[in-house]
C-alpha cells in the first residue's frame, strides 16, 4: 500500500488509521460528509464538525495522521458559510499540531495491554462496527477505547495466543485490561484456558494490575462465570447460587479512583454482579456492583460495569489505571486537575501542550513532571504550548 485513507468518527477510529506503519502517508476523512442527511435546511453540520474535530484531536496529539480531508458533494457546503469558515480554522490548527507532533514520540507515563482474541490484528478496532456509529450493545465498551486513544500511555493489544506463546509478555505491562460482553471475541470466553489463566493470575499476584469491564473473562464453568473472579473480586449470579448468601454490599464512597466522580454513568448495566467478601465496592445500584477494587497477592484488580465516553469517565478510568498499577503517587505528573483539559508532552522538542477539550473556557492547575504546578486559563477548544 502507498497510503491508507479512512473515515474518522472518533479518536479510536483515528488511531486505527494513524498507527498503521510502513506506508507513505495516512489520511483521515473527517465528519460530516457533505451529504444531504446533514446538509439540509434544518441540519447542523457545524455542530457535528466541532464535536468530530475535538474528539479526534485527543488522538492526533498522541499519534497524528499525515493529512486530513472532507468528502462528499462540495456544492452542499456552499449554503453553510459558517461551516466553511470553521473548517478553515480546523485545517490551520491541524497544520500547527502537525508541525509540533509529526515524527515526535510523546511521553508515555504507563504501559497498558488490552487482551482479546484479536491482539494487534484489530489494533484499535475492538467493538467497532462501521466507523464510529453508536450502538446500544457496544457504547459501554467503546468509551474505554476512546479514553485510551488519547491517554499518555503506551497501549498494546495482546491476543490470547500471544500469552500462550510467551506468558512473560505481560511482565512489561503496568496494567492489562479485558473489556466486553460474555462469549465475544473481545472478552474471550473459551479462550481462557489453563495457560492463559495461570499467566494472568501469576502476573497480578506478582504486582500487576488487571481491569475488567462488562463481563470480563466470562464463561460459565466450574461454578463461576467470571474466570478471574478471584482477581476482580466480583462474579455474576446466573441463578445457580441464589441461596448462597452475599453479605458484601457496603459502598466505600471515598476512594482514590472516585475522587473526582460526581455523576455516575455505567452505560448498559450488567445485572447481578456481586462482590466477594474481601472486595471493596466503590459504586453499586439496585444490588448490581458497578465499580469495585480487590487486592490479589501483590497486585490489584478493578471491575467496572461499563464506561460510556465522557470526560468525567475518562478521568475515572485514568485514576483506575494508576490505582491498578500501584502508582497513585505518580499520577500528578504532567497532570491537569480539570478533567476537561489534557496535557501532552514531547521530550524531543522540549515542549508540552495544555488542551481544552470543550467549547467552554476552562481553568486548570497543571502539574509538571517535577511536581511543580501553575494555573492556566484556556478559551474554548484552545491549545497552549509551553517549554518543559
Where are these regions (language model features)?
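Glycan-processing catalytic domains of CAZymes
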Residues: 1-171, 175-190, 194, 212-214, ...
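A short helix->loop->beta-strand "cap" motif at the edges of active sites that frequently abuts
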Residues: 23-24, 206-209, 299
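Extracellular ligand-binding/catalytic regions of CAZymes and related secreted enzymes
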Residues: 46-55, 64-111, 147-150, 180, ...
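Residues at the C-termini of beta-strands that transition into short coil/loop
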Residues: 116, 159-161, 214, 267, ...
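Conserved beta-strand scaffold positions in the cores of enzyme catalytic domains, especially
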Residues: 155-157, 210, 281, 301-303
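Surface-exposed loop/turn positions
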Residues: 174, 208, 380-382
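A glycine-rich, often tryptophan-bearing local segment used as a flexible ligand/cofactor-contacting loop or short
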Residues: 188-262
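Active-site Gly/Thr loop motif
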Residues: 265-276
